[in-house]
């Protein structure tokens, strides 16, 4: 019984890894100029503090990812994901998060 359980969860884990690896995500698209400017501002506002810079860039990355399915999440969604907000273009519609979301 334990062997079967381990085999089942191993197969399940491998399937999950393969699906996640093959999924088209927002990070796979080229970064728009407005997002690049937002990243530059985040780095500038950190004033050389690497920890604050990392937090700010992570926050921008998460908002960009979450804005693909919900443009009303934050006011800056059109700047972070112009592919998806306010109108979804072809690049946005190809994303797996948008298809499944």
Curated annotation (Swiss-Prot):
Q: What is the lineage of its organism?
A: Eukaryota, Metazoa, Ecdysozoa, Arthropoda, Myriapoda
Modification note: Contains 3 disulfide bonds.
Q: Name one GO cellular component term.
A: extracellular region
| Major location (coarse) | secreted
Q: What does this protein do?
A: Voltage-gated calcium channel inhibitor.
Stated name of the protein: Omega-scoloptoxin(10)-Ssd1b
In which tissues is this gene expressed?
Answer: Expressed by the venom gland.
Question: Family per UniProt?
Answer: Belongs to the scoloptoxin-10 family.
Cellular compartment(s)? Secreted
Q: Secreted among the record's keywords?
A: yes
**Could you tell me one molecular function GO term of this UniProt entry?**
calcium channel regulator activity
Give the superkingdom in one word: Eukaryota
